[in-house]
Amino acid sequence: MHSSSSLIKLGFLLLLLNVSLSHAQLSPSFYDKTCPQVFDIATNTIKTALRSDPRIAASILRLHFHDCFVNGCDASILLDNTTSFRTEKDAFGNARSARGFDVIDTMKAAVEKACPKTVSCADLLAIAAQKSVVLAGGPSWKVPSGRRDSLRGFMDLANDNLPGPSSTLQVLKDKFRNVGLDRPSDLVALSGGHTFGKNQCQFIMDRLYNFSNSGKPDPTLDKSYLSTLRKQCPRNGNLSVLVDFDLRTPTIFDNKYYVNLKENKGLIQSDQELFSSPDASDTIPLVRAYADGQGKFFDAFVEAMIRMGNLSPSTGKQGEIRLNCRVVNSKPKIMDVVDTNDFASSI
């Protein structure tokens, strides 16, 4: 009995050690020796993309956010459809709005040329998000790396987990808490990613014309801002027209998003909820603090980004390092494998 009990305790301790080591493998210095070029490659790729697409930085940050909220930061959002699973690209929160996949493809091809079979797509997306923020004038931070890529996508989970533009504050809190982001500062700081980028008219039409099926606009919307938005998104107009999240500094990563919320000029309902909802007693002080001090916002954003980046990472021998971010690696037949390096380089 004693021996059996000891073995059970030993097994439990080994399990805890394995979990601890798995998380410990995420490190800002993970690629210092194996692929230090990855950071410059990411920066240069985004710089090139920005010349023709000023909103690409915001789009890449959003991709990383939507990746991490579904099964952790595992690059599952980058996978295309297969016969085995539906892609997350088809989920409600991504279809016809998630973008930047081609930029990640270009980045990955350059990284594979410089450091073959070394940098995961999950890490690359996290690094690209950080570089996007920096290039838009936001804060810098060291990205903990060492993630592995998932072997499948999770469309149904994406539909369940991703916040929507019309989410109430309580729904937002629940969705953040469900993935492990349980601090009010996580929600408020990460929502600040809407300080740059654009949104489609289709996601704000109810706010402008028929809020909660009332036949009237959202009463929390500033009247002058409502008039501006109605000109950009007229009733029966083109629902794909793009509107800036932040009219003040639409391409700059700053704290104006929170200034807008204080003035009831949040573009989508889920943003304005942080300041105007009856449930906002724990988020209003943070909105005020970030509006009054950009440094406070930047510090909180960096902390929240690192916390989000640490959500359920696949590390060690879990998952794989994809050679193409859109598809899982081909598995060789045992009889065909003579030199694994030759095989891998031919995929």
UniProtKB/Swiss-Prot annotation:
Keywords: Calcium, Disulfide bond, Glycoprotein, Heme, Hydrogen peroxide, Iron, Metal-binding, Oxidoreductase, Peroxidase, Secreted, Signal, Vacuole. Disulfide bonds join 35-115, 68-73, 121-325, 201-233. Ca(2+) 2 binds at residues 195, 246, 249, 254. One of its GO terms (cellular component) is extracellular region. Heme b binds at residue 194. Its EC number is 1.11.1.7. Binds 2 calcium ions per subunit. Binds 1 heme b (iron(II)-protoporphyrin IX) group per subunit. The active site is at residue 66. This is Peroxidase C2. GO terms for biological process: hydrogen peroxide catabolic process; response to oxidative stress. Substrate binds at residue 163. Belongs to the peroxidase family. Classical plant (class III) peroxidase subfamily. It comes from Armoracia rusticana. It is an enzyme of class 1 (oxidoreductase). Glycans are attached at residues 81, 210, 238. It is found in: Secreted; Vacuole. GO terms for molecular function: heme binding; lactoperoxidase activity; metal ion binding. Ca(2+) 1 binds at residues 67, 70, 72, 74, 76. Residues 1-24 form the signal peptide. InterPro entries: Haem_peroxidase, Haem_peroxidase_sf, Peroxidase_pln, Peroxidases_AS, Peroxidases_heam-ligand_BS, Secretory_peroxidase. The record marks 62 as: Transition state stabilizer.
